[in-house]
Regions:
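Conserved ABC ATPase "signature" region
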Residues: 20-27, 119, 123, 131-148
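Conserved catalytic motifs of ABC-family nucleotide-binding domains
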Residues: 173
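ABC transporter nucleotide-binding domain
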Residues: 195-285
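Conserved ABC ATPase signature
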Residues: 152-156
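Catalytic Walker B motif of ABC-type/P-loop ATPase nucleotide-binding domains
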Residues: 177-181
Length: 328
């Protein structure tokens, strides 16, 4: 489906000119540049129907990669093939098979009703009338579009506009959809609707989806697989569940108990579990590394040595894990 081999993108940034007439004149005839490696030797293979989270900090190379995968940018070297096509060289044919959402950038027409934008896109992508009617009904139900179809895009709230954007991106039943920060700035309810919609479209049509986001709940809800990039270089590529196991993820056990009786543990947990008391000493938070302590054994020790009123186990969030990777 998507095959990326030894992909590189180098931006040339003009060097700052030193003060002085001679330096300015020299630069006029022989401009010098610094090379900035936005993406370095990236190789990926993405199967049909996968939802892949492509994540990293600002400036890591995510958006540059997506722009090359969508045919907006031409790689400096290496190759990209999507369904056998080169996104840049075969762009006019290629774009008919993809859908794209770039954060706040709209593909809808600002001054006309949403339904008219969708009808124009229907003609652009040559969507048969029967398919258009069926998809519009499906999108209206899934994204609650009925209330906004006859409003112009400029009248819509951000959440309403993004629901319409998703309908536009999936209207022509693309084989691949690229989502670059699709839920940025949205409230919790709209995010949930959009995640649910994307999941349904993936399951119903086996659509391949590439997602970049800073909202890591999007990743946890949607993605089968995660690729982590840093300074243009791939750091991790595998199932989301492996992210938790491969790095020093922490787990927290929160217990409530009689504040007059401090928490006791067996000797085997000495120096492995950090205990912090809060809420007037009636609540204790026990933090430890997954690889050092078995949660079940710790809980057994807690129950054997203490009178516990309540107990909650919390895993590290993927955001905390990613942060720990970057500070290494």
């Amino acid at each position: 489906m998507i095959e990326i081999t030894n992909l590189n993108k180098i931006y040339k940034i003009r060097k700052r000119v030193s003060e002085g007439k001679f330096s300015v004149l020299k630069n006029f005839f022989s401009t010098q540049y610094n090379d900035i490696n936005a993406v370095s030797d990236l190789s990926l293979y993405i199967k049909k129907g996968e939802i892949v989270g492509y994540i990293g900090t600002n400036g890591a190379g995510k958006s540059t990669t997506i722009k090359m995968m969508t045919g907006i940018l031409n790689p400096t070297s290496g190759s990209i093939r999507v369904n056998g096509m080169d996104p840049f060289k075969d762009r006019s044919k290629y774009v008919k098979d993809i859908g794209v959402i770039f954060g706040q950038k709209s593909q809808l027409f600002w001054d006309i009703p949403v339904i008219e934008s969708l009808k124009l896109l229907k003609k652009i992508y040559d969507v048969p009338q029967k398919d258009f009617d069926e998809r519009l009904q499906y999108f209206s139900d899934a994204l609650k579009l009925d209330e906004i179809l006859n409003q112009s895009v400029r009248q819509l709230s951000l959440g309403q506009k993004m629901r319409a954007e998703f309908a536009a991106a999936f209207l022509h039943n693309p084989k691949v959809v690229f989502l670059d920060e699709p839920t940025i700035g949205l409230d919790v309810n709209i995010k949930y609707q959009i995640r649910k919609f994307v999941k349904k479209m993936n399951m119903k049509f086996d659509t391949t989806i590439i997602l970049t986001t800073h909202d890591l709940q999007d990743i946890e809800y949607l993605c089968h697989r995660v690729v982590i990039i840093n300074k243009g270089t791939k750091m991790f590529d595998g199932p989301l569940r492996d992210v938790y196991g491969l790095f020093d993820s922490k787990k927290t056990v929160i217990v409530t108990h009689d504040e007059r009786k401090p928490i006791k543990l067996g000797n085997e947990f000495f120096n492995l579990v950090n205990i912090e008391q809060t809420n007037g000493n009636s609540t204790s938070k026990l933090t430890f590394l997954n690889r050092e302590v078995e949660t079940a054994k710790l809980i057994n020790s807690l129950l054997e040595n203490n009178e516990i009123n309540d107990l909650t186990v919390k895993n590290s969030t993927i955001e905390e894990i990613i942060r720990s990777i970057y500070v290494r």
